[in-house]
Structure formats: C-alpha cells, structure tokens
Amino acid sequence: MSLTTRSSCPACKDSRIKEIFSLPYNSREMIEFLSSYYKGTIDIKKLYEQHYKLLECGNCNLIFQEQIPNKKFSQELYEKYIDKDDSLKKKDDYEKKYHKKLFYEMSLIKKIFKKKNEEISILDFGAGWGFWLNYFKKNNFDVYAFEVSETRIDFLKKNKIKIIPDIINTDNKFDFIYSEETFEHISDPKETLINLSKILKENGFIMLRFPSSFLFKLRLNDGYKPCTDCAHPLEHINLLKKKSFENMIIDSNLEIINFKSKFNFSLRNFLKDIKNIFYFDSVLIKKINK
C-alpha cells in the first residue's frame, strides 16, 4: 500500500501549485471514513505517516490529490478492496434507472455520425461491468471495451463484448470514445486523453463524464470530513475543470464542443448545456484536421 507524490499539475504540468487542504491519514475522521467505506479490508496503519493533501494549480485551476496510490495499490483498490458485489448491485435495473440518459447519449451519437448503428464503432474506456456498452450493443452499435480489472474483463467477455487490451498498441480506430467516472481516478489525465485521441478516427469524438466539483472549495473548512464526494480520498484524485481540459488539448488536434445540443437540438438539451457551463460534469471533444 504505497503512495506516490505528484509535484506538478497532472493536467497542464505547471508547477505553480498551492495546498488548499490537508488531513493526516491517521486522523480520526480519515480512519472512520476509510474503515467504513472499505469495510475494514484496508490496513490503514500503513498510511499513518501520509497526508491527504489537496493542491490547486495556479494555471488551470485543477484541484488534485498530492499523494496518490501507486500502480500496484491502485489496482488493489479496484480489484481487491472495493466490494465487487456492492459494485455490481449498484447496476441493478441499470437500463431502467438510466433510460433517459442512455437514450440521450444514443440520440447524440446517431445525430453526430448520421450513419447506420452497426457502422458506428464505440470504445468505452474504463468500461467496468459493461452495462453502458451492453445497451449500445443491443442497439446494434459496434462496441468495444477497455478495462483493467480482471474480474470485470471476465464479466464483459461473458456478455460477448469485445476487449481492447491496450490503448497504445492497437490497430483499432473508433468513431466515438466514451468514459464515465474514470478520468477522476487516473494519475495522468493529459497523457491518457492524448493517447485516446490517437485511436480516434478523423472527426471522431470523445465524451467524458466525471463528478462535478462545483462550489467544492466552499466546503473546505475546519468542519470538512472526507467522504465519497468529488475528492474521495485515494480514488477521486483529480477534480476536473473546463480550464484543465483546455490546457490538456493545447497543441493537439482536439477541440472542445461547448454545446452538445448543436447536434441534437431541443430546449431541454440546450438547458443541459447551459447547466454544464457551471456544474461541469461532462465534456465532448472532437478530433479535427490540422
């Protein structure tokens, strides 16, 4: 259970960062949270000499955890310490619970590409149990998954979903790459975004969803306690901002689409875009010719 330290912004690589919150891992609040959330599976004493620190980038305003799990510990969190049964149970009646969201996303994709479903290739990066992809598979899209958890990969394979084992060494190219509640977990969001763009077809799109950090800084006072919010200790290591994405794509062949409703216009969709300007929990990015 080792932590590694980030000394510069993972979004823009700027070193002008400041500490905005700190809490020892051996504090009562942190021990109570980690013990409860991970159901006693983590040996918290191994973290006692470390601090949960939130830093803010002076350039792109990204808030991020300074000390984060190394690759081995991160894999253990996802595969060993997070209760798999609870994780899977949360997906009960997935399509019924999220019907409106799924229909909106499918309509958006169809409007963007204007071709038959089976001709549209989709990659879900960080696919988890694959319920999002399964909805699109049922609607005849050409779907693929990238996932790091062996348990979840086995589940995906049982549901006949094609797996991409590596986003670096693959010949596959995709029309649309989707990722939900993944980018807040990864240590290198900029590098990951650029690597995803390399397996995107020309004029393809990347859509990312993540927890909103709207007004989060107002909660950072002496009474703040760690919880499963946008700054979840050890897990939500990046609190993503639009300015952060703008910096990530500098000198790339990517551009941010501010209004998704331009492809699928309705008053409801337009108002969603207005809300997202402030709340910001999703971003649509297009690959352009340069």
Q: Residue ranges of each PLM-predicted region?
A:
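Surface-exposed loop/turn positions
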Residues: 120, 203-204
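A short His-aromatic
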Residues: 181-185
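Conserved N-terminal segment of class I S-adenosyl-L-methionine
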Residues: 1-180, 190-193, 261-264, 270-283, ...
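S-adenosyl-L-methionine-dependent methyltransferase catalytic module, highlighting the catalytic core
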Residues: 3-6, 155, 187-195, 205-290
